[in-house]
């Protein structure tokens, strides 16, 4: 089967840096911090008091008030991002309905909805929970509601692979088009679990930063790092077969050229020693795209700000790229957004495509104290104009799920 070329024709995002792509990318370029005190519940008695919250998003710009009440927040954020991406792409959803698929990930789904309805059940009896509880809470509903809202009748799925899910979604969509199944895919990830149980659970694992200073909380690759900061939001892309995009005169941001996915098969939360799984995943991606290691100029790293992730990912980059590793601009945009879990791969794919378009690497902010175990070029604190042809985006999830995408600058 002849492999078809795949390009990005639409971008959309709602995240702690902004409620659309233009505002979010401007903030990322400028090194703005989207992290602040938790406002979605009273966190005064919690060790963790900071998160990357979406601010000022109005779901009624996407669905009416009655319908919004039937959806969890992660679904509404996904609909906001998808609406922007679809409008940006200029695709005719009605005319192309049978040709457009949806793959959108969520790692946890409607956790706040589960908490709210459990409290209601405890108070009034479990048979008095909302009849919309189950369809609000299940993780596939972001993908399903996007398909319903826009009438998209191609394949519709939801990878639930923790923090790798958004990247799996984009990668699976890429292969779906490349291998001839659909010409257009709407793909990405969404998450919103800034709630007592979500924050409490990750704090109990000692995964979250307990800093009370927004400028000293999300510290990827810095020696002071002590855990990630929870973020929320969604990033959605429209991928399209190249000739289909050209035929309708679509604007093209970048080309998707490679995808790899594998499993550590080591531990349910800790990465494999030396980043073994990440090494294999990046190698699979380069092989899939026919890319030589020395061709990679930029990596949007998983870069969570936990001690083990950042040192293992750095070791993996050294192992894959050898001496060239020090010439790569390795960035963690989680320093600005926090960690969007299943939504991370979506927004980071958006940022990587824009980095290639603008020939600009956004910074890793809050970087002050180098760690001998993290010794790459992390573009500290100030973004950088630079020539780049190929870029990777890494996502490494609980369960040992690893996913990586390769993008190429569009020369058209």
Name each model feature, range by range:
Residues 1-67, 243-253, 350-365, 408-412:
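ACP-dependent fatty acid/polyketide chain-elongation machinery
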Residues 5-9, 32-36, 213-289, 297-298, ...:
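Condensing-enzyme catalytic core mediating Claisen C-C bond formation in acyl metabolism
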Residues 8, 24, 29-161, 190-199, ...:
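Conserved beta-ketoacyl condensing-enzyme motif
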Residues 22-27, 112-126, 176-179, 199-212, ...:
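A glycine- and small-aliphatic-rich helix-loop capping segment at beta-alpha/alpha-beta transitions
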Residues 78-91, 139-143, 147-191, 229-250, ...:
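Active-site-proximal alpha-helical scaffold in enzymes
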Residues 85-96, 245-249, 282-298, 320-324:
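Phosphate/pyrophosphate-binding loops at sites that engage ATP/ADP/AMP, CoA/4′-phosphopantetheine
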Residues 123-130, 171, 175, 191-247, ...:
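Glycine-/small-residue-rich "gating" segment that lines the acyl/pantetheine channel
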Residues 266-275, 304-321, 326, 340-347:
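Short glycine/threonine-rich loop-to-helix capping motif typified by GTGT followed
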């Amino acid at each position: 089967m002849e492999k078809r070329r795949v390009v990005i024709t639409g971008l959309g995002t709602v995240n702690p840096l902004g409620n659309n792509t233009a505002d979010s990318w401007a903030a990322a370029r400028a090194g703005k911090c989207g992290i602040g005190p938790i406002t979605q519940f009273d966190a005064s008695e919690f060790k963790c008091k900071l998160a990357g919250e979406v601010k000022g998003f109005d779901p009624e710009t996407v669905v009416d008030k009655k319908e919004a009440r039937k959806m969890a927040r992660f679904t509404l954020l996904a609909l906001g991002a998808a609406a922007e991406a679809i409008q940006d792409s200029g695709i005719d959803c009605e005319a192309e309905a049978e040709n457009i698929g949806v793959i959108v990930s969520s790692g946890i789904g409607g956790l706040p909805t589960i908490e709210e309805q459990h409290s209601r059940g405890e108070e009034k009896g479990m048979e008095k929970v909302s009849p919309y509880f189950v369809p609000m809470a299940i993780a596939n509903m972001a993908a399903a509601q996007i398909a319903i809202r826009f009438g998209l009748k191609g394949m519709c799925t939801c990878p639930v692979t923790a923090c790798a899910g958004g990247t799996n979604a984009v990668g699976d969509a890429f292969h779906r088009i490349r291998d001839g199944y659909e010409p257009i895919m709407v793909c990405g990830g969404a998450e919103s679990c800034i709630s007592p149980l979500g924050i409490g659970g990750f704090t109990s694992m000692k995964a979250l930063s307990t800093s009370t200073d927004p400028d000293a909380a999300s510290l990827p690759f810095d020696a002071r790092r002590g855990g990630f900061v929870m973020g929320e939001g969604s990033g959605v892309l429209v991928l399209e077969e190249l000739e289909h995009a050209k035929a309708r005169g679509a604007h093209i941001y970048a080309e998707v050229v490679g995808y790899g996915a594998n499993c550590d098969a080591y531990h349910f939360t800790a990465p494999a020693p030396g980043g073994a799984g990440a090494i294999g995943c990046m190698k699979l991606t380069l092989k899939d795209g026919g890319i030589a290691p020395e061709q990679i100029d930029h990596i949007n790293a998983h870069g969570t700000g936990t001690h083990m992730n950042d040192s293992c990912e750095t070791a993996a980059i050294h192992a894959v790229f050898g001496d060239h590793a020090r010439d790569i601009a390795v960035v963690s945009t989680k320093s600005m957004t926090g960690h969007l879990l299943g939504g991370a791969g979506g927004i980071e794919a958006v940022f990587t495509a824009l980095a290639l378009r603008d020939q600009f690497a956004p910074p890793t902010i809050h970087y002050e104290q180098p760690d001998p175990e993290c010794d790459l070029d992390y573009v500290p604190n100030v973004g950088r104009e630079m020539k780049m042809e190929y870029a990777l985006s890494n996502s490494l999830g609980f369960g040992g799920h690893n996913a990586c995408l390769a993008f190429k600058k569009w020369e058209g």
